[in-house]
Amino acid sequence: MEKMRVVLITLLLFIGAAVAEKAGNGKAANNPAEDASDGEAINLVEEAGGIGDAITPAEGKATNLQAYESARFKKFVTHCSSHVAQTCSGNDPLHHQEGGHGINVPLGLSFCLFDSMEKCLGDHEAKLIDPNPGPMSAIPNSIQSQQLLIETVKFRTVLKTCTRVSAQFCLTAPNVDTSVLPACLGPSLNQCVYPAADAFTPGPPLELPPIIIYN
């Protein structure tokens, strides 16, 4: 009888140990973070942080210069800035649109600056392609390079930002004297697109206002 009791107690202890071990394994499986003490846990959020980062206005102006600064654009952008400033400061009826988008308001002026810059670069065979070009067969051979496509898309983004900034900075009032606009627009565009000191003829620094996104 005594022997049977010892066997029974031993069996119960064995079963209890097995149950406890199983429960411990289940806890570790349900909480991998607690079971990762012997290895470095992988942070998927940090790993994916650099994937598909969109270019922001601030990054485009200040830190991503090398990403789009190709000779293809830089060769003509200073010349085109001067030409565009003259074009958008005049009284060309093509740039006076109804609905508050004329060149006497910042939004209309920024549209004029961007469209005129796009046309000027195109005239110099440095055309800005549409970032959503459609079939690959429609893309000219000279811009089939993937790297050039990336540079072009980024350049368009920066240029759109800079035309808005320059329009907001230079067109301080609806009745601003258009004769003084070219002297402001040209340097403002150049300084915004290429802040590097050797990118254009140095001049007094401009304090640009905060970027305003128009709906």
Curated annotation (Swiss-Prot):
One of its GO terms (biological process) is nodulation. InterPro entries: Nodulin. Transmembrane segments: none annotated. Induction: During nodulation in legume roots after Rhizobium infection. The keyword Signal applies. GO terms for cellular component: peribacteroid fluid; peribacteroid membrane. It comes from the Eukaryota. Keywords: Membrane, Nodulation, Signal. It is found in: Symbiosome, Peribacteroid membrane; Symbiosome, Peribacteroid space. Residues 1-20 form the signal peptide. Belongs to the nodulin 20 family. This is Nodulin-22. The lineage of its organism: Eukaryota, Viridiplantae, Streptophyta, Embryophyta, Tracheophyta.
